[in-house]
């Protein structure tokens, strides 16, 4: 009789274990998926998120070479650093200047008006050296990790 009791107990434990929800392991669709990281960068289920992409183009008021231009660009770089430090500016960089295309900003926002206000604080915009075009952009949420990676690969960060 004890053998039957232990056998029955073992069977119930086995069946019971199968009906209890298991602790969640890796996602079978993507074993590398990190839900904590995904939430931190604002990722949706596809690993994407919304941004505002800003294209900087040559404006109507070219500032000639000299102290005023130097000071304007010094302020431009300081403004980008401030916005990046605040977690608002995700990516920035220059274009080749062809067809008046001067640079690119990607902001961690989906609100064009809010982004317009942030961009208006840049001296190159305020002085008319450049004008900005605003576009909603849907891209990888991993872009939010670029700043931390940049600091690891830039020998002389900006």
Predicted regions located by residue number:
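Conserved, structured core segments of small domains
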Residues: 23-158
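Bacterial N-terminal signal peptides
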Residues: 7-16
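Positively charged n-region of N-terminal signal peptides that target proteins for export
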Residues: 1-4
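Sec/Tat signal peptide C-region and signal peptidase I cleavage site
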Residues: 18-22
